[in-house]
């Protein structure tokens, strides 16, 4: 056990010493390169000098060897020296050139084993944010609550909007319902890989829902209000029992009659939502507020109480009130002020006089005022 502990301590010390002197490895590599380059230059220098000397010796010894034959022995010696010089020069030059080429082609191959691991490059660090963004987007797309919205919400909004509280407000509510339904269809995404939420309708039902907007064709039924011709009977306002007749004006759905003609024109657009798979474009989202405004304005114009007011009703409002106002506690008030006041007078037990100058039929209200004066 002690020997193992000693061996481990020795190894740890060696590792620490190696880490301490690890910075010397690159210095040693640099020293090697410098030494090799210096040696190659020296060898090349010596080779050049020997070649030059051998050339001079040949130039001098050759004529002497030819002309002066007695000096044959020194000439042979000189030739041998020249040959050795030429060989040494060539070998030195080749070795020097080989060292230089090796340094140029493979500068750090010798110390590659001791070199540390390669660090990440600057380009890889710059590309890291894009890589992280792509991974985050892929994960967010697969989250059901964030990436893919089910079609159930859009369709439920459209159905809620179609329910109108009153007959007069049908056009307005239907326009809002259609616009919301279109928004829902555009915002929804085909949830192929995403199951619908717990309270949503089944996936098979959504395609059948858009056919519902064709129902607004029903407003054509108000053609029956031709019956309101009954109000002509009040030509005999002298009878006190006549006020029982005002029940007829309560029934008339006559005001919807002018709105009934333009109302069917608005539902002509709903067939467009039959193609929900198209993704919402940026321009369509920008045009949505103007579309909603136009639909609201059309609906308000078609409402008789807001948009279209008859000329006679305006005149009756601008005219004078009957003189019998103080005596009869408001009996002589003009009926052009609204049907709601006539209903209040019924509940209080007061009989209000009917005038033929209603704004709907375009008759003047002077007869009602004269009757009030006579009473």
From Swiss-Prot:
Region (Disordered): 144-284, 303-375
Region 23 X 3 AA approximate tandem repeats of P-A-A, residue ranges: 207-275
Listed Basic and acidic residues bias regions: 148-179
Biased composition (Basic residues): 316-331
GO annotations of cellular component type: membrane; monolayer-surrounded lipid storage body
Membrane-crossing segments per the record: 21-43, 55-75, 81-101
Keywords, alphabetical: Lipid droplet, Membrane, Repeat, Transmembrane, Transmembrane helix
Principal place of residence: other
Entry membrane topology: Multi-pass membrane protein
Protein origin, superkingdom: Eukaryota
Family indicated by similarity: Belongs to the oleosin family.
Function: Many of the major pollen coat proteins are derived from endoproteolytic cleavage of oleosin-like proteins.
Entry protein name: Oleosin-B6
